[in-house]
């Protein structure tokens, strides 16, 4: 029931939006983990190949706008907010903005759809830390379940894959969230 909520909150990882953002972003992501500077520079080189920009923030903006439009087309007038774990707009800032706007109850959609510590529980911890940073005026946040195995998500993913494979006689498909260093993959 949409009347239970004052807003929807999209929660994402975040990503750099310019070459100048890359190293500060990576330092934020790896904060407290003692990742060698050389490794950060290696990862930064991956971003350099794409102009120092992660596509994630643009994709989340497009999703936010499409979701707001879809809700309005169905007669649901809920603002759609967005907060990231690791880069602007940061989750604590978004939580503070929602509190300032008088928003009391939020439905959060974590855009990492699979279930693991970093894609599920850590986001819950991030949401709670953001609430704590705001204090008593912070909205109550309910989270939508991980959606990796939701039948409609699976069907949409299968449809996109089928469309992408048109014209290939045969293909091998590997599913991955992102790359990992070869040294980690080797064990």
Spell out what each predicted region is:
Residues 1-187:
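Active-site-proximal alpha-helix that buttresses catalytic centers in soluble enzyme cores
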């Amino acid at each position: 029931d949409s009347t239970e909520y004052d807003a929807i909150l999209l929660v994402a990882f975040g990503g750099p939006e310019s070459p100048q953002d890359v190293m500060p972003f990576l330092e934020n992501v790896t904060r407290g983990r003692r990742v060698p500077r050389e490794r950060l520079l290696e990862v930064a080189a991956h971003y350099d190949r794409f102009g120092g920009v992660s596509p994630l923030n643009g994709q989340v903006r497009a999703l936010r706008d499409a979701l707001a439009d879809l809700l309005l087309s169905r007669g649901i007038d809920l603002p759609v907010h967005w907060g990231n774990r690791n880069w602007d707009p940061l989750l604590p800032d978004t939580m503070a903005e929602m509190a300032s706007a008088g928003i009391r109850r939020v439905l959060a959609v974590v855009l990492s759809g699979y279930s693991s510590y970093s894609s599920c529980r850590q986001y819950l911890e991030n949401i709670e830390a953001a609430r704590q940073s705001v204090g008593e005026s912070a909205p109550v946040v309910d989270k939508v379940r991980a959606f990796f195995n939701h039948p409609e998500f699976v069907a949409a993913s299968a449809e996109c894959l089928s469309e992408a494979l048109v014209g290939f006689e045969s293909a091998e498909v590997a599913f991955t969230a992102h790359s990992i260093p070869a040294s980690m993959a080797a064990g």
